[in-house]
């Protein structure tokens, strides 16, 4: 049985490929504008809604990542100005990246979240402008991708690196493995 990844995120696709398991991509199409002020609950709710929107049989994996600084939640920047504002706000500070994950099995739904703390260097206006113009980070929570050029913005990280990229693959693996979903001899999902 294949896993269905309810995401078109190239980063999540690449991370799931690291697990060497068979999967197909069926992007969810939900309205992500929900009213939730708690970033952990927001990420978990969005991942849950994404997973539940997929009606095909199989193990559905969905995720949503948010960045939070103090009480502000950063999703994907709307435009250049918004990306600049986000990166300027994160400059020289610790922030938290939260990824909510939902795995929908036939008879069970598991939702959890992972938190990783990231500290940015002090970013000059020129570096922020260069980054936005070069990396085009408009599809990334917080306006940056740590696995790409965004790595030059980061001073320290505490926690799961892959969570910041968009999927805490170790925890996903553990859940699939613990439920006997991985056939170690074939490297595929069991039925």
Curated annotation (Swiss-Prot):
Keywords assigned: Cytoplasm, Hydrolase, Nucleotide metabolism
The protein's required cofactors: a divalent metal cation
UniProt entry tagged with the keyword Hydrolase: yes
Enzyme Commission number(s): 3.6.1.9
List of catalytic residues: 64 (proton acceptor)
Keyword Cytoplasm: yes
InterPro entries linked: ITPase-like_fam, Maf-like
Cell location: Cytoplasm
GO molecular function terms noted in the UniProt entry: dTTP diphosphatase activity; UTP diphosphatase activity
Catalytic activity reported: dTTP + H2O = dTMP + diphosphate + H(+); UTP + H2O = UMP + diphosphate + H(+)
Single Gene Ontology BP annotation: nucleotide metabolic process
Site feature location: Important for substrate specificity: 11, 65, 147
GO cellular component: cytoplasm
Function statement: Nucleoside triphosphate pyrophosphatase that hydrolyzes dTTP and UTP. May have a dual role in cell division arrest and in preventing the incorporation of modified nucleotides into cellular nucleic acids.
Family stated for the protein in its record: Belongs to the Maf family. YhdE subfamily.
Protein name: dTTP/UTP pyrophosphatase
Organism: Thermosipho africanus (strain TCF52B)
């Amino acid at each position: 049985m294949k896993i269905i990844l309810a995401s078109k995120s190239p980063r999540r696709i690449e991370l799931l490929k690291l697990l060497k398991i068979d999967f197909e991509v069926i992007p969810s199409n939900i309205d992500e504008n929900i009213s939730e002020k708690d970033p952990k609950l927001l990420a978990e709710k969005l991942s849950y809604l994404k997973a539940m929107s997929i009606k095909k049989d199989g193990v559905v994996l969905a995720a949503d990542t948010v960045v939070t600084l103090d009480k502000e939640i950063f999703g994907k920047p709307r435009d250049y100005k918004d990306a600049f504002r986000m990166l300027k706000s994160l400059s020289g500070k610790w922030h938290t990246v939260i990824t909510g994950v939902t795995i929908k099995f036939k008879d069970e739904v598991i939702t959890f979240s992972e938190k990783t703390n990231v500290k940015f260097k002090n970013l000059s206006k020129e570096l922020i402008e260069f980054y936005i113009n070069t990396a085009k980070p408009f599809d990334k929570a917080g306006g940056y991708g740590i696995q790409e050029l965004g790595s030059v913005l980061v001073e320290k990280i505490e926690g799961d690196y892959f969570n910041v990229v968009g999927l805490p693959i170790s925890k996903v693996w553990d859940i699939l493995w613990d439920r006997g979903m991985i056939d170690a001899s074939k490297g595929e999902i069991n039925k």
